[in-house]
Structures are given as C-alpha cells and as structure tokens.
C-alpha cells in the first residue's frame, strides 16, 4: 500500500522524534519474541490450570507452535454500547481456530458510563476508571499464556485504559 506523501513524511518525523524513548519498548518486544511463547515456560501445573476449561483447544494449547490469543472484554449487560461484545469471544475463537490457533477470554474489565452516573454518588469513579481498567487488563494477561491479545471496548475512558495495558502486554 502506498502512503500519501504527507502521511509518509509525518510518520517518518514521528519515528525519528520518538526513537530514543521507543527503543526500550522495541527491545522489550524483541526479547519477548526471541524468548518464544510465554506459556512454554509455565510449570506443568500452571499449564494445566490455564488449559483445563479449553475443551477442544487443550491439545492445541499444549503445543507452542499454535498461537494463543488472549481476549480482554468490557462486555456487560447494562451498557448498550458494550452489548455487542457478548458474542465476540465465540466469533474470535472460531476465526482463530480456523487459522490454526487458539483464543481464550483472559478476563473482563470494569466498564462504566459517566452518562449514567452523572449526578449520582460515585460519579467521580470515572475519573480514575482508566487506571483501574488498565490494571484489570494487565491482571487478566499476567498469566503468561498468551502470544497476543485483542481488547474489546468502547468509550473515552475504557479504550485509553485498554491501550495502556496493551503497551505492556
């Protein structure tokens, strides 16, 4: 794909400007890639716990040649914007399975809407919900069983929290 020349120039400037601060991140990602799938380094009991509820994917998970995708979701029944995420994990599992990999829901993160809580006691929780969401997503992915992750979320508080977590996992 050919980039528009302005976008190409801006991208090059951003890469050059952020080179020093981005280097530690790139080094960390390269070290993780060179180390191989994290789940290969788990203890037998750790792997047993991680795969126990995986049904037909257990055998595939036990091999480190098949990628395992972690799914972090903000699905809940109360907020209409999140409701479509109810079916996404099954759809993602099917697509990943068809491609030869596995996918597991790593965890759910809290999701709130300040439009619902405005004027209510507790509405100030939205001010630090990004940090809580980032921490919750990090906890969900801390089991070292995933080769990649997909984050299902919407909203100006939730997506930044998920992006913060994505920078570490």
PLM segments and residue spans:
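Metallocofactor- and cofactor-centric catalytic cores in central/energy metabolism, strongly enriched
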Residues: 1-169
